[in-house]
Design a protein with these regions (language model features):
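N-terminal secretory signal peptides that target proteins for export/translocation
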Residues: 1-18
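Short linear sequence motifs
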Residues: 8-10, 25, 40
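Enrichment for repetitive, rod-forming helical segments
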Residues: 13, 27-28
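Sec-dependent signal peptide recognition
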Residues: 20-27
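C-terminal motif of bacterial Sec signal peptides marking the signal peptidase cleavage site
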Residues: 32-33
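Sequence/structural signature of beta-propeller domains
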Residues: 37-362
Length: 362
């Protein structure tokens, strides 16, 4: 069985453009001796669409995931969690196709394996890793035709007990096998799951490299697998606010990329990978405390490049990004970000064209 992550490469012209921009930006940082910046003049981009608000009041919307329909990109899907009630499925314009009350679903992630969509979520109601498998053929119509019961017990699925209070989750395919990282609420543990064997194969401590660790506020939530480069990037919250990178094969720390002493304002939250080709591109991080989004080089040593804001978006938790071309709608892919306020309505997710981000960096 072929287990290959869904990867859409950007065109050569875009690759050359982005590579040139990356070189110029890094050169600029070196030339001007840029380190931590208090400059508030970050470029601001507008969003091109937004999802309908979630049903729950207050802090509820949290984490998105994107599935790209390679046969018809207009019929791609955005999954979004209401961490107090369940999972939404939206079209690319933010319209609700399906919503199901599944409990306190905090984070969600997915991969495509053969012709199936594998979706994982962190269920805080039951302290379980919930693992759903959907056939990709006709999946858009499936969610459209099942507006309130798409996550059916008749589907192939698993509810895996974590044995701890859980928080965030991310999924990857490492050495051909589906895996997941599951983080602990108000704790320092990250579980590494083998999703073929449906079991935990390692647990590591996100504070193991630190001295004088505070007693509270050390949990991680946001994380992302870089399947091709075999990394896990984890955003560690609390007073120190680290973005850390681990080896996805042995879960050993590779590097502390950034912190509150650098370019992170408040808690680092959602983290995502924008792929230019199989191994190059960008890491994007939600710097929640100052409502900006940091850009880093995807390759080691993960150099900080710059930051930007999204118009009228603040206090962002989860994010997801894809480089897949969505035609005239978003030729260089989209970034989906949770909006922590969205006043006067309940929280929702904003959809940003990555073309606008790159234009602002010119």
């Amino acid at each position: 069985m072929s287990m290959v992550p869904q990867l859409t490469l950007v065109p050569d012209t875009v690759f050359n453009y982005l590579s040139k921009k990356l070189t110029l930006l890094i050169a600029g940082l070196i030339l001007f001796g840029c380190t931590a910046s208090n400059d508030d003049n970050y470029p601001t981009v507008s969003y091109i669409a937004e999802t309908e608000p979630v049903v729950t009041n207050d802090d509820a919307a949290d984490d998105p995931a994107i599935w790209i329909n390679l046969d018809n990109t207009a019929n791609s899907l955005i999954f979004g969690t209401d961490k107090k009630s369940g999972i939404y499925v939206y079209d690319l314009k933010g319209n609700i196709l399906s919503y199901q009350n599944l409990g306190s679903i905090n984070n969600v992630d997915l991969r495509v394996i053969d012709d199936e969509l594998h979706l994982v979520s962190s269920n805080r109601s039951d302290s379980t890793l919930d693992y759903w498998i959907f056939p990709t053929e006709g999946i858009y119509q499936y969610f459209e035709n099942n507006p309130d019961n798409a996550f059916s017990e008749e589907l192939k699925h698993y509810h895996l007990e974590a044995g701890m209070d859980i928080y965030g989750i991310c999924m990857g395919i490492i050495n051909g096998a589906p895996v997941a990282a599951l983080t602990e609420e108000e704790g320092v543990r990250v579980q590494y799951w083998d999703l073929t064997q449906l079991k935990i194969i390692n647990t590591f401590d996100i504070t193991a490299d630190e001295d004088n660790v505070p007693l509270l506020g050390n949990e991680a939530e946001g994380c992302v697998f870089d399947d091709e480069n075999k990394y896990i990037h984890v955003s560690r919250e609390g007073a120190r606010g680290f973005l850390k990178t681990y080896n996805a094969e042995n879960q050993q720390l590779v590097k502390v990329i950034d912190s509150r002493d650098g370019n992170v304002g408040g808690d680092p939250e959602g983290v995502a990978i924008y792929k230019v080709d199989a191994t190059t591109g960008y890491i994007i991080l939600s710097s929640q405390g100052d409502s900006k989004f940091n850009i880093y080089d995807r390759e080691y040593p993960f150099t900080y490049i710059d930051s930007f804001r999204v118009d009228n978006v603040s206090d962002t938790d989860g994010i997801e990004v894809t480089s897949a071309s969505l035609g005239d709608y978003a030729p260089n892919g989209i970034l989906v970000v949770q909006d922590g306020y969205n006043q006067p309505d309940n929280q929702n997710f904003k959809i940003v064209s990555m073309e606008e981000v790159f234009k602002k960096k010119e």
